[in-house]
Curated annotation (Swiss-Prot):
Region (Disordered) residue spans: 103-127
Localization: Endosome
GO BP field: endosome organization; regulation of protein localization
Chief location bin: other
Subunit structure: Component of the biogenesis of lysosome-related organelles complex-1 (BLOC-1).
Entry function: Component of the biogenesis of lysosome-related organelles complex-1 (BLOC-1), a complex involved in endosomal cargo sorting.
Gene (name only): BLS1
Compositional bias per record (Polar residues), positions renumbered to this chain: 105-117
Protein name per the record: Biogenesis of lysosome-related organelles complex 1 subunit BLS1
Length: 127
């Protein structure tokens, strides 16, 4: 039993010891370095990066925005205009398809009897 109590007392002495060991010195140095890195170096690195980012990216982009903003402002309704053009194209395609189908059904119903030679309408519809 004395060996168990002796081990516990040695363990308590080691755990509660105020004496610095090589390991505790290394740990303290690591913690101090970490604090220095986070408080000093990281902040200066972020500041430097922010300045570089602003100089290389943000300021040129802002200059382009200022330069071309008036041109873009005139084209704000471009999407609406393209929607109207797209709609008109679809209407024309549907109309042309309807005419072609109507012509084909007319020719099959009448056997092509009413067809005139080289009619300009037929040439247009054949295209």
């Amino acid at each position: 039993m004395s060996s168990k109590s002796e081990l516990e007392s040695l363990l308590n002495k080691i755990v509660k010891s105020n004496d610095e060991t090589e390991v505790s010195k290394a740990l303290k140095e690591i913690e101090d370095n970490n604090e220095y890195i986070e408080k000093k170096q990281l902040r200066s690195l972020l500041t430097m990066h922010d300045k570089k980012f602003k100089d290389q990216c943000l300021i040129p982009m802002n200059n382009l925005y200022v330069k071309y903003n008036d041109i873009v402002g005139k084209d704000r309704n471009l999407q609406n205009e393209t929607a109207f053009v797209d709609r008109d194209i679809r209407v024309l395609e549907s109309t042309l398809q309807y005419i072609i189908e109507n012509k084909n059904s007319h020719n099959t119903n009448h056997g092509g009897c009413n067809k005139t030679k080289n009619s300009s309408k037929d040439k247009l519809l054949d295209k």
